[in-house]
Structures are given as structure tokens and as C-alpha cells.
A protein has these predicted regions:
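PRPP-associated nucleotide enzymes
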Residues: 1-176
Length: 176
């Protein structure tokens, strides 16, 4: 395992005002993804902490979390389990609903995606209020798996998502 480079990841995250709606400042990770050595360093920084005790799987949340999670699973040499929006998975699923500013949404995981007691690392691109990750935690608990960490590229600390996800350990590479 190569030790991750020291990188200022914020330099590779673009701010897009008023996207997707007016008043929202969108943190765009596509510049980070497009810069191969920087993307690799971000994945290695998230992976480095787990090389002594690998998870059984990485659980990755749609949509940008799937990009990060698949790369992280590959780096760790473990499988990746997708958590997707309702109706996107073809087999029997568990479902969890969570609240958004403007309503509710649902996430799903295949019922046979994880074995009882599996140790899993949950990954998404950004932690805001914790709603999406909270719903994912419900799905993982329903599968009977054990959460070892919640990993994010970006954390919006003012929205206090980390506090809502207690007692699970949270790691983020960049904080705003």
C-alpha cells in the first residue's frame, strides 16, 4: 500500500452557487475525480485507516457515493454493495425512507447483499444533514451487518450531520 500523498483536496472541489436550486451552494467533486493522482490520493487516504482490519464490504450510496465507494472497495480488495434510489435494484430489497427539505425519498438495498454480522464501511461523497446516511444505516441494520465507519469526501459541519449519526465513527477528508 502506497501512503497517500499530502493533497489540499479543497483545491479540487468547485463551488457552484444556486445549484440545484437558488440559495444552495453545491460542492462539485468532478474536478477531483478528473485529476487521476488527486482522486487516487483521496481514495488512498480513506483506505489507509482500514488496511490493518479490512471491512467485509464497502456500502456505497447513489449516486456520487457509488463512484467513491467502488474505487475504495477496489483499493481495499473487497466487494462493493450499492444502495440505490427506490425502484433501481432488480432483486428483493429492503427499503428506508428519509426526509428532505421538500419531501421524502427512499433508498433500497438487496436483501441478500450482506451476510449477518458482516463488517461494512459506508461511503458517500458528502455529509450534510445525515438524512441519506441515516436511512442507509437503517438498511444495514436490517441486513444484520455491523457498521465500522462512515466515510465521506466532504462534510458540511454547520449542518450537524455527524451528530445525527452518533454513535457511528465518521471520517471526512474536507470540512466546510
Amino acid at each position: 500500500m502506497i501512503r497517500p500523498l499530502e493533497v489540499d483536496f479543497k483545491r479540487y472541489i468547485r463551488d457552484i452557487p444556486d445549484f440545484p436550486t437558488k440559495g444552495i451552494l453545491f460542492r462539485d467533486i468532478t474536478p477531483l475525480l478528473q485529476e487521476g493522482p488527486v482522486f487516487r490520493s483521496a481514495i488512498q487516504a480513506l483506505a489507509h485507516r482500514h488496511h490493518g482490519s479490512l471491512p467485509d464490504a464497502v456500502v456505497a450510496i447513489e449516486s456520487r457515493g457509488l463512484i467513491v465507494g467502488a474505487a475504495l472497495a477496489y483499493e481495499l480488495g473487497v466487494g462493493v454493495v450499492p444502495v440505490r434510489k427506490k425502484g433501481k435494484l432488480p432483486h428483493k430489497t429492503y427499503q428506508a425512507t428519509y426526509t428532505l427539505e421538500y419531501g421524502t425519498d427512499s433508498l433500497e438495498i438487496h436483501q441478500d447483499a450482506l451476510t449477518q454480522g458482516a463488517r461494512v464501511l459506508l461511503v458517500d461523497d458528502l455529509l450534510a444533514t445525515g438524512g441519506t446516511m441515516g436511512a442507509t444505516i437503517q438498511l444495514i441494520e436490517r441486513c444484520g451487518a455491523q457498521i465500522i465507519e462512515l466515510a465521506f469526501l466532504i462534510e458540511l459541519t454547520g449542518l450537524k450531520g455527524r451528530e445525527r449519526l452518533t454513535p457511528h465513527p465518521v471520517i471526512s477528508l474536507v470540512q466546510y
